Amino acid sequence: MAKALPLISCDSWADSINEEDVEPKFKYHRLANDLKYMLNADVITCSAVHLKFLIFGTFRGRVCIFDHQGNSVYSNLSASERHTHQVAVNNIDVDHKGEYVATCSDDGKVNITGLFSSDNNHSLSFGKFIKVVSLEPDSKAHIKRFVVGDDKLILYERNLLKKLKPVELCSVEGSVLSICWHGNFIAWASHIGVRVYDLNERCSLGLIKWEVPPQERLENFRCHLRWSNKHTLLIGWVDTIRVCVIRKRNSIEASTGNLPVYIVDPISTFQTTFYVCGLAPLSAKQLVVLGFRKEKSSCFKALRPVLCVIEYKMNNSEEICTDSLTLRGFEEYTVNDYSLGGIIEENRFYIVAPKDIVVASLIETDDRIEWLIKHSKFEEAMELISANGGNVPVLSVAKLYINHLLALKKYDDAAKLCLRMLGNDKVLWEEEVFKFVKCQQLRSVSAYLPTSDECKLDPHVYEMVLYEFLKFDVCGFLNLIKEWPSHLYDGLAVINAIHDNFRKHYANQLLESLALLYSYQGDFESALRMYLKLQNKDVFQLIRRYELYDVISKLIIPLIQLDRDCAFEILLDKKKIKTEIVVHQLEHNQEYLYWYLDSLLKKDPSNVFQKKLISLYAIFDRNKLLPFLKRSKDYDIQEALVICKQENFYPEIVYLLGCMGGVEASEALNIIIHRIRDIEMAIEFCKEHDDSDLWNALINEFSKHPEIVTKVLDGIVDYFSPAVVVGKIKMGQNIPNLRQSLIKMLRHYNLQGEILSSAQQIQLNDYFEIHSEIVTTQRRGQQVSYEQLCSLCHRPVLMAGTHLYCIIRLECGHVYHKPCIQGELLKNCNECNLWKLTVGK
């Protein structure tokens, strides 16, 4: 079983050289089990990774096979006690099916070994160092071909006699350093660069020259070749990576000479900050690269190797993440001691060192979730679970996130998260709410608590929230009372809590809260009293909503004090509250009674309480008293007179005395003359009553005052004989403007005579004109047709032998036979009873 190691740790074998909060791409574990025994006794010099197993070549020349967990696997390789090679194994290759293994060594041998069959085993001895060998990868091939590289590139295949036949493919500049075979293309590296050989065309597609590193030899660095697909070749050599595409030449390129069908096109070339120890494809534009750092430690030792994910573009690249790996003995290794194998289908990569093997697996969803949680990236973890699923429930992450936010005192964010994640789960809500209780931050979650019938929490939860608001935020407490349905909590318990924690500084908010709570409980009288203490006009809305007209009978004065207009809007409606009740309540507040009765008079002019307005108008608004006395008849004149006399309201007294008539009218005139002293008013008073005694009294009084005689003369025209006034003037008495006044009076009488004469003449003219028109109309003939019937006998009016004088036609248009009416004169038409008889013929 593979031993699991910490993902990334400075003290362990893998550290991230990025910032700690950057999400890793890989998780790592070290291979152990049977493999560790081999590593204790020997050193790995080369390796091959297959989908089924792992094969390692050692310094002592052995070839060992293990499963992916490091357990030894029995095969033909392990059946033999002898070493496969005499010295260190240089290269291992496995066919696609995992049936044959090819190895080579400095002992000059190349061995082709069937793991489970010996039918096609071969052992070739070249008598010189053999660095690379490669099996044909084609899984459909029954007869395996292989390529050996020394100072030439040689293909071995069977002839007709089933014997191996060597075919020299290419001569080599120096020696073959690396081979990678895929389909019909063989990529191989020499001392000057990389070539691709086309087996179908039996030709090289060209040389990709490689830059020689300064103060180094190119052959001192292992060239790493890998096909990411059948037309894309990855090359990593020294500190340069090149991505090449094998494509067919276009028509223009193919026309320029005898050239191969295919061409090698480098599509991306970039340098790294380290030496390349191996590479593999990760995605369309990403590579996994094992690197050896160029720098040395302070002790001039090698630094830890790095595993990078690089995203490449045309001629540049970007390191997505870089992990520094602590492998056993790394300080003593060189760049060629490391290799990178991979199972691309499973995104699993093997970092192979002489004394250690570490597996890097692309981090899975659950691993990512674990890392995100560990680094407090809860939001990203929940998004990942929502998108890709996983073994960790999203609610578990949400709970951890809530705890984290509460620890950071981000209470509002935690509350919003509750709303988003807890849904309508009552149990979850109650569980999470108690976390806010411990922080005394129920106020933060209050706006998000479920209040619907689908998810109603325990009343105790809502009460705890209200108590916290009552303690720390009275305004917020009031808002909750307004917003929350009253059935969520025990209203009486909250009312008691307010009384126990009443603070005068927040009296307004607490009184309004009590008013609302009392109304929720149906105790409307208490609610009204709270509103009135508060002087809150919402009391009127409450009265209308719940029709509390019986309740307000004892609260009329406070309601008027709060808002007179709103109060009267209710009090003036007899259907809601009786007038008698209102008047009784206002008896001891004369001003409010005046306001009420004055408003009531406008709405109900015949109300029985209007007589009280006389004394009220006398006190609060005298200007309304006289119009009221003139307009209303439902009061006692004597009582009104007493009130007016007490206040010396002379115009009102004059009006009342005038209404009484007789002696009282003379008293009224006397008041006008001696108290009010208004001649025009006196004249108008006499005109109104048209009493000769009043006129005589007026004339006698004012004849003593020459300066106002002319005013009397002007005023009495058409009402009293001016001769009486003139007769009262004494001989030799000087009357200002008398002449003008007399002329004016005479002209007035003259004008009246002319108007009367003209009116008579006009009337006579109209009479004669209308009379003439009537006579003319009555003499005019009337049409009678043959279709008309007698309205009595219903026979045609005009028949043979009928005399015209025997027909009678009425104004309404109906006609009769004269014999039918038996000689009687019709006063009305029998048909329509509308017109009198007008014409008889």
From Swiss-Prot:
Keyword Protein transport assigned: yes
Positions annotated as zinc finger (RING-type): 790-833
GO biological process, one term: protein targeting to vacuole
Knockout-associated phenotype: Impaired autophagosome clearance in fat body cells of starved 3rd instar (L3) larvae. Accumulation of Notch in photoreceptor cells and boss/bride of sevenless in R7 photoreceptor cells of developing larval ommatidia.
Similarity comment: family membership: Belongs to the VPS41 family.
Assembly behavior: Part of the homotypic fusion and vacuole protein sorting (HOPS) complex, composed of Vps16A, car/Vps33A, dor/Vps18, Vps39, Vps11 and lt/Vps41.
Protein's name according to its UniProt entry: Vacuolar protein sorting-associated protein 41 homolog
Organism: Drosophila melanogaster
